[in-house]
């Protein structure tokens, strides 16, 4: 079967939820038995989001093969079974870098390099390559129609529609239909102007997804269809909902998947969304609730921890609990004290970089350890737990990470200078290495030690989890820390790197160097988060007055 392409654009304003809409449509098509993947094209000049500020861009989502990508790829993986890869996300920076590399190499035989055709051809090649072997590829273009940055991408997709044939392509445009309280009605003019903007660059949308805080009335949908040159059945009302996992059914109920299949002449069975119905049932019928404190450095923007937030909610679904997340700035722990941690059922310290707020995180780990509160540390959250234990239990009072103090006399955490990737290839790094794209990234095998809490939680001897770090436990000082009671419960495949630590005489204190949040989904959850949330409920029950 030839590959079919759905191109998703956004208009009027940003943050309308193109990624959620694209992922929801993909989940319906997948439920109809189609082989679907989703790509994200980002117009910014950064090569990838790996070195971008989390408070500006949100989290960096890491794929199985180690790509540092946009957080929308996390949405994609949470909605469909297909895993993302390096081919599923690329930026203007990556495209321009590749074109310039080819020019320096002489690939263009002395031609004058221009946006058209060289940049647009590179974009088209990557879209086609990323969609090979798929029935449907959904391609989301970041930004808003009218932005100068996205013009090369839109032009490339316009050309691609001509190249592969309009019968194999569909343009889906998300737009805002605002409700004006003083007028008591929704207004379609912004949508009309957004479509006009698309038409000016040669793109006629085939489907309009109309975002609003309420359902769009039938007469307004007819008006949009008339003025925007689309069939009325292709004007989809997408109102605000209490759960993003309700959107697949909302789109299906309006026949979007049927419209797509008719357009591409795909003969496939009706979508079975019973798994999503189960997710929504568990979400709507909890048997209790827990409050988990997330102590981080980027809490002013919750999207900086998007996958962690979602993984906690998924664990709530697994345990039939509502998970309330209390965000606490680790710097506030330094200035206001651990009183901010009172009343929590569990504590989670997520990943991060740099020294700011680290001492607050260390005090948080100490508070959780001493008060027997369930603790989950992720990446930096593991490293600070190790530092705390080394200082306050193992007698290494000057323990620190060389990331925070290069002259530290007791560096219990240091730069990884050499490791093996999943394929057995040796990677090396030094202090002089670039920051971008040089970390230990992607899926790595982890061996779990028998008799440990981690082994019990996972129920397996070997697991595969995704990493994103350049510092690790210093094995030279590890024996002294282990002698004081800390347990290493997970090691890398070559047994050289510490992956998980835990405290045996604590009800639930586990910290991992990897990022388990990247593989959690609403339908399946994740064993580590599920165990953590269950421990939070057990702690709550044992401390009831």
Swiss-Prot record:
Activity regulation remarks: Allosterically activated by GTP, when glutamine is the substrate; GTP has no effect on the reaction when ammonia is the substrate. The allosteric effector GTP functions by stabilizing the protein conformation that binds the tetrahedral intermediate(s) formed during glutamine hydrolysis. Inhibited by the product CTP, via allosteric rather than competitive inhibition.
Domain Glutamine amidotransferase type-1: 291-542
EC number(s) on file: 6.3.4.2
Residues that coordinate or bind L-glutamine: 352, 380-383, 403, 470
Listed GO MF terms: ATP binding; CTP synthase activity; glutaminase activity; identical protein binding; metal ion binding
Reaction equations catalysed: UTP + L-glutamine + ATP + H2O = CTP + L-glutamate + ADP + phosphate + 2 H(+); L-glutamine + H2O = L-glutamate + NH4(+); UTP + NH4(+) + ATP = CTP + ADP + phosphate + 2 H(+)
Residues that, per the record, bind UTP: 14, 187-192, 223
Amino acids binding CTP: 14, 147-149, 187-192, 223
Catalytic residue positions: 379 (nucleophile), 515, 517
Any one Gene Ontology cellular component term annotated for this protein: cytosol
CDD domains linked: CTPS_N, GATase1_CTP_Synthase
SUPFAM superfamilies listed in its UniProt record: Class I glutamine amidotransferase-like, P-loop containing nucleoside triphosphate hydrolases
Keyword Magnesium: yes
PANTHER family per the UniProt record, alphabetical: CTP SYNTHASE, CTP SYNTHASE-RELATED
Family: Belongs to the CTP synthase family.
Alphabetized NCBIfam families for the sequence: PRK05380.1, PyrG
Protein name: CTP synthase
Organism: Actinobacillus pleuropneumoniae serotype 3 (strain JL03)
Taxonomy of the source species: Bacteria, Pseudomonadati, Pseudomonadota, Gammaproteobacteria, Pasteurellales
Protein's gene: pyrG
């Amino acid at each position: 079967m030839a590959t079919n392409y759905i191109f998703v654009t956004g208009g009027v304003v940003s943050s309308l939820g193109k990624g959620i809409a694209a992922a929801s449509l993909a989940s319906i098509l997948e439920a109809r038995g189609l082989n679907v993947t989703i790509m994200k094209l980002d117009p910014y000049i950064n090569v990838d989001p790996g070195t971008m500020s989390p408070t500006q861009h949100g989290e960096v989502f890491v794929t199985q093969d180690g790509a540092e990508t946009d957080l929308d790829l996390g949405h994609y993986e949470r909605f469909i079974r297909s895993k993302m890869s390096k081919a599923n996300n690329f930026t203007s920076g990556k495209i321009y870098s590749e074109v310039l590399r080819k020019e320096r190499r002489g690939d263009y035989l002395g031609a004058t390099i221009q946006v058209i055709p060289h940049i647009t051809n590179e974009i088209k090649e990557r879209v086609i390559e990323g969609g090979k072997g798929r029935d449907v590829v959904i391609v989301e273009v970041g930004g808003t129609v009218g932005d100068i940055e996205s013009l090369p991408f839109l032009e490339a997709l316009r050309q691609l529609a001509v190249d592969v044939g309009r019968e194999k392509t569909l343009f889906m445009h998300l737009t805002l239909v605002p409700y004006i309280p003083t007028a008591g009605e929704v207004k379609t003019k912004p949508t009309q102007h957004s479509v006009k903007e698309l038409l000016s660059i040669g793109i006629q949308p085939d489907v309009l997804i109309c975002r609003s805080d309420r359902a769009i009335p039938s007469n307004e949908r007819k008006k949009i269809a008339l003025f925007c040159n689309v069939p009325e059945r292709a004007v989809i009302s997408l109102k605000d909902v209490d759960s993003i996992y309700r959107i697949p059914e909302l789109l299906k109920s309006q026949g979007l998947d049927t419209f797509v299949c008719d357009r591409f002449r795909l003969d496939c069975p009706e979508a079975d969304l019973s798994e999503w119905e189960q997710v929504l049932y568990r979400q709507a019928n909890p048997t209790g609730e827990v409050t988990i404190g997330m102590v981080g450095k980027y809490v002013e923007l919750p999207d900086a921890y998007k996958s962690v937030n979602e993984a906690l909610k998924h664990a709530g679904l697994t345990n039939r609990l509502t998970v309330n997340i209390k965000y606490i700035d680790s710097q506030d722990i330094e200035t206001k004290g651990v009183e901010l941690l009172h009343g929590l059922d569990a504590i989670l310290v997520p990943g991060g970089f740099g020294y700011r707020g680290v001492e607050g995180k260390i005090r948080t780990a100490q508070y959780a350890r001493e008060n027997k509160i369930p603790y989950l540390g992720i990446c930096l959250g593991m490293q600070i737990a190790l530092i705390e234990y080394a200082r306050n239990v193992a007698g290494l009072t000057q323990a620190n990470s060389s990331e925070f103090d290069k002259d530290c006399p007791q560096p219990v955490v240091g730069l990884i200078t050499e490791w093996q990737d999943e394929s057995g290839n040796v990677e090396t790094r030094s202090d002089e290495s670039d920051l971008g794209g040089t970390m230990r990234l992607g899926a790595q095998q982890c061996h779990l030690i028998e008799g440990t809490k981690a082994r019990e939680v996972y129920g397996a001897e070997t697991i595969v989890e995704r990493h994103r770090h350049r510092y690790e436990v210093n094995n030279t000082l590890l024996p002294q820390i282990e002698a004081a009671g800390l347990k290493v419960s997970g090691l890398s495949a070559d047994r050289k790197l510490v992956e998980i630590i835990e405290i045996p005489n604590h009800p639930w204190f586990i910290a991992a160097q990897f990022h388990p949040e990247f593989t959690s989904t609403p339908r399946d959850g994740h064993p580590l988060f599920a165990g953590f949330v269950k421990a939070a409920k057990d702690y709550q029950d044992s401390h009831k007055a």
